Swiss-Prot record:
Residues 207-226 bind DNA. Its main location: cytoplasm. This is Global transcriptional regulator CodY. Keywords: Cytoplasm, DNA-binding, Repressor, Transcription, Transcription regulation. HAMAP family: HTH_type_CodY. One of its GO terms (molecular function) is DNA-binding transcription factor activity. It comes from Streptococcus gordonii (strain Challis / ATCC 35105 / BCRC 15272 / CH1 / DL1 / V288). It holds the Pfam family CodY. NCBIfam families: codY_Gpos, PRK04158.1. One of its GO terms (cellular component) is cytoplasm. The lineage of its organism: Bacteria, Bacillati, Bacillota, Bacilli, Lactobacillales. InterPro entries: ArsR-like_HTH (IPR011991), CodY (IPR014154), GAF-like_dom_sf (IPR029016), GTP_trans_reg_CodY_C (IPR013198), Transc_reg_CodY_N (IPR010312), WH-like_DNA-bd_sf (IPR036388), WH_DNA-bd_sf (IPR036390). GO terms for biological process: negative regulation of DNA-templated transcription. DNA-binding global transcriptional regulator which is involved in the adaptive response to starvation and acts by directly or indirectly controlling the expression of numerous genes in response to nutrient availability. During rapid exponential growth, CodY is highly active and represses genes whose products allow adaptation to nutrient depletion. It comes from the Bacteria. The gene is codY.
């Protein structure tokens, strides 16, 4: 009991960590590392859309195909759809189970591998799943108590993360709207033409060519780009005779310009 209490305190202490420790790309790597070390297993956290938020591997279990999921930071759609249907913790799933984290081609290497999946709910909202697994040791009752506590702790952190993401999105959209509102009619036409030249969110363009094509002066394009760049919506770099390299930092600008019908 004392050992369980000590582990419980370690898990709940995760809530006291500073938000500055979150990494942008995999914001919960540190949390999964702590959980994996406390429970002596591998662990990962995925949201309800399959995005990998963090993982930590204490033991090698994967092959190149599965490692690719960690590189792309997305889990297969079929797996996530099935995982999202779980409303209570599913413990010690064998390698043959559809929700086993062990890939089919490695089942013979880890015949005793066991997967436990705990849904992450906060205020009735499904935010994702906490997945832990071991090569050959069963998760006992103490482990499952820790899993339930862990999923609650992670849920609180995910809710905070989601709230911060929502606030960031609102700030980004507001910045785009305010910047676009400062553009003149000609500058709006210029921005629309410029965005149409890009290959996705970045590309090379020649201001004089665009200016001639839509019947405006080059200075209009320069002014429009300067306004967007000062608002943090784009970044640009002169390529000399080759034109200008442009990268869109806030993609919401595409939709905002489209709404203006330019």
């Amino acid at each position: 009991m004392a050992h369980l209490l000590e582990k419980t305190r370690k898990i709940t202490s995760i809530l006291k960590r500073s938000e500055e420790q979150l990494q942008e790309e995999l914001p919960y790597n540190d949390i999964t590392r702590q959980l994996a070390e406390i429970m002596d297993c591998n662990a990962c956290i995925v949201n309800s859309k399959g995005r990998l938020l963090g993982y930590f591997m204490r033991y090698k279990t994967n092959n190149d195909r599965v490692e690719a999921f960690y590189q792309t930071k997305m889990f297969p759609d079929d797996y996530i759809r099935s995982a999202n249907l779980i409303y209570d913790t599913e413990a010690n799933l064998p390698v043959e189970h559809e929700l086993s984290i062990f890939p089919v081609e490695t089942q013979s290497d880890f015949p005793d591998g066991l997967t436990t999946i705990a849904p992450i709910h906060v205020s009735g909202i499904r935010l994702g799943s906490l997945i832990i697994w071991r090569n050959d040791e069963k998760f006992d009752n103490d482990d499952l108590v820790l899993v339930e506590i862990s999923s609650t702790v992670v849920g609180i952190q995910l809710l905070n993360f989601q709230r911060e993401e929502d606030e960031k999105n609102i700030r980004r959209r507001t910045a785009v709207t305010m910047a676009v509102n400062t553009l003149s009619y000609s500058e709006l036409r210029a921005v629309s033409a410029i965005l149409g030249e890009l290959n996705g969110n970045e590309g090379h363009l020649t201001a004089s060519v665009i200016a001639d094509r839509i019947g405006i002066t080059r200075s209009v394009i320069v002014n429009a780009l300067r306004k967007l760049e000062s608002a943090g919506i784009i970044e640009s770099r002169s390529l000399g005779m080759k034109g200008t390299y442009l990268k869109v930092l806030i993609p919401d600008v595409f939709e905002e310009i489209k709404k203006r019908d330019y």
